[in-house]
Swiss-Prot record:
Keyword ATP-binding found: yes
GO biological process, one term: nuclear capsid assembly
Gene name tied to this protein: IVa2
Highest rank taxon of the organism: Viruses
Biased composition (Polar residues): 10-21
Location of region: Disordered: 1-72
Keyword Transcription regulation: yes
Keyword annotations of the record: Activator, ATP-binding, DNA-binding, Host nucleus, Nucleotide-binding, Phosphoprotein, Transcription, Transcription regulation, Viral genome packaging, Viral release from host cell, Virion
Protein name listed in UniProt: Packaging protein 1
UniProt organism field: Canine adenovirus serotype 1 (strain CLL) (CAdV-1)
Localization annotation: Virion; Host nucleus, Host nucleoplasm; Host nucleus, Host nucleolus
Amino acid sequence: MEEKAGLRHLQNQQNEPSQDPHQCADPCPALHSDRNHLNKEAEAMEGQNPTCSRHESAYPIQSQVSKSKKQRNYVDGAAVDDLKNLWDRLQTLQQSLTEMPYAEGLKPLKNFTSFEELLSMGGDSLLNDLLDIQDSITQCCIRASKYLNKEGNCTSLNYYKQPFIAAVYGPTGCGKSQLLRNLMSAQLIVPTPETVFFITPQVDMIPPQEIAAWETQICEGNFLAGPENTVVPQSGSIMPRFIQMSYAQLTKDENYDVTSPNNIFANAASKGPIAIVMDECMEDLGGNRGIAKFFHAFPSKLLDRFPKCTGYSVIVVLHNMNPRRDQGGNIANLKIQAKVHMISPKVHPSQLNRFINIYTKGQPTAISLLLKDIFNYHRLNTNFDWIVYNTEPIDNCMHWMYLSPQEGLIPMYLNIQGKLYQALERIHRTLTDRQRWTRYYHSKKK
């Protein structure tokens, strides 16, 4: 009958799917049913048994968590400009590293032949990393610009940080005395001192011409140009005082006690900021009598006791960066407490290299060699320029600075040079990996 009625079984027809053991015997309506069609079967929510028997779906109900995408999957116009700016800086740095005399033991870094080759062959991963480095450099420049004037020069050495302890290193004839006066007249030490104590081994060592130069330049540094051809004093004193003292007077016991009425420094600090300048005193500093308290203990007591004393500065001149005689430990303590080291390029290269090796341990070797090359260039081509190292700069761009009578105090941005060298290493690593995989591919083809 079935054959006659055309109800023949189809060949190769699959059997009915077996009942799911987890399925309820009686169908139950879905949690959200159609109110107009109550009997209409709807898909159940996750966790419910379906109302009809069907194969389990091969796809999960929950969508897979999408993977994080790259920051940039294409290079737009602004990114191309950033990369071009970075590329120009990289070319300048790589050329400087290649041409400097200290580059003999430096590892050469591979690079693209042109900016167009970098864009076409660099790849998304490399270009994104370079853009991140460029963004970091831009942020560093923005943060540093807050402390610079319109010409890009630093406006101060200490930016009101107290106490200000500085060491000046340089041989005879490199302009140390002129530098000390320029620090006062250019207002690179803030606040401006109202009293300057000039310490020498003997008082009669200073010629009258130098005394007149000191008095003139500290007076010049006490004023700024105001409106309508007026001048504005920068301290509470119209005429700052210049006091000469011998090293023996400095080391009197009464001058260590801030409560003593005969303490000459306390009397001056009760009226305003003070500065102590020690010149030609290296032999006395190497003696047995210690004066290290002038570098750490004495300033804190003086600043706490006299509110008008908003600034305490000590500047010590040394002819040798590593003197053999330091019986009292004064020079060693000075180097530890000094926040600023002002170095003449005329200092012996062996002493310079030792100082650079100690204070550039966080920088790549190439940047340390670049700094040595900068010192060497100014040693051969300039006379009265200085390189300044700040242990506690207000911004990382100002760890190393360059002081010129013509250009002023300029940051050297060695931290940015380190980031640029990091970008060169990133390019070198990419090209090296590609060459290694190319060699591996050709070796397998053989």
